[in-house]
Curated annotation (Swiss-Prot):
Sequence similarity: Belongs to the universal ribosomal protein uS2 family.
Entry's localization field: Plastid, Chloroplast
Organismal lineage: Eukaryota, Viridiplantae, Streptophyta, Embryophyta, Tracheophyta
Protein name according to UniProt: Small ribosomal subunit protein uS2c
Gene Ontology MF annotations: structural constituent of ribosome
Length: 238
């Protein structure tokens, strides 16, 4: 895998608050190698290591995107949801930003069945078929469609398991992470000072609570994915 330059600036990360961890009482000792200091009762992440792992993650997603691989971005807490959706849409990735439904990956056949129902309902709604049903039946289907849109809207075009999963907030998305581990799907995780770096294939030590921090990390990864996709499109067109 070729190493590239991703314009990762320590100053930019500091401005986004990437270095701020959790209180010193709420930490995982396995994060010790990624912590550079304590300040006013808060652990401070070593941004040099953050830059190194973020660069490694960018190399990985660029290489994967240049080979036509598929990505899933997961971040369901309120502070991450909007950034996850906009980043995923920009890079043409799948995403989950409301709730991870247990078994979404490990019980893929059930998820696939739900997606088929979702697609059928969308088609029926677009063709105006729901408006021709009895009010009670139409109301039930509209509620079902709304539910699907909320929880499956970001994966509605998925036809199989993703090749790489990017996870925002390891603790919040623990179920998703465990499913990836079970299936052997590589993960890139933002890990705050209360996380376990050993659970991720590529851990990125960073503040997973600040919107600016989440957005900066996602923007770097998405930029690398977009460049990789451009490379893939160019190779296919030759």
């Amino acid at each position: 895998m070729t190493r590239r330059y991703w314009n990762i600036s320590l100053e930019e990360m500091m401005e986004a608050g990437v270095h701020f961890g959790h209180g010193t009482r709420k930490w995982n000792p396995r994060m010790a190698p990624y912590i550079s200091a304590k300040r006013k009762g808060i652990h401070i992440t070593n941004l040099t290591r953050t830059a190194r792992f973020l660069s490694e993650a960018c190399d990985l997603v660029f290489d994967a995107a240049s080979r036509g691989k598929h990505f899933l971005i997961v971040g369901t807490k309120d502070k991450a949801a909007d950034s996850v959706a906009s980043a995923a849409i920009r890079a043409r990735c799948h995403y989950v930003n409301k709730k991870w439904l247990g078994g979404m990956s490990t019980n893929w056949s059930t998820t696939e069945t739900r997606l088929h129902k979702f697609r059928d309902l969308r088609v029926r709604a677009e063709m105006g078929q729901l408006s021709r049903l009895p009010k009670r039946d139409a109301a039930i289907l509209k509620r079902q469609l709304s539910h699907f849109q909320t929880y499956l809207g970001g994966i509605k075009y998925m036809t199989g398991l993703p090749d790489i999963v990017i996870i925002i907030d390891q603790q919040e998305e623990y179920t998703a992470l465990r499913e990836c581990v079970t299936l052997g799907i590589p993960t890139i995780c933002l890990i705050d000072t209360n996380c376990d770096p050993d659970l991720a294939d590529i851990p990125i030590p960073a503040n997973d609570d600040a919107i600016a921090s989440i957005r900066l990390i996602l923007n770097k990864l998405v930029s690398a994915i977009c460049q990789g996709r451009s490379s893939y499109s160019y190779i296919r067109s030759r």
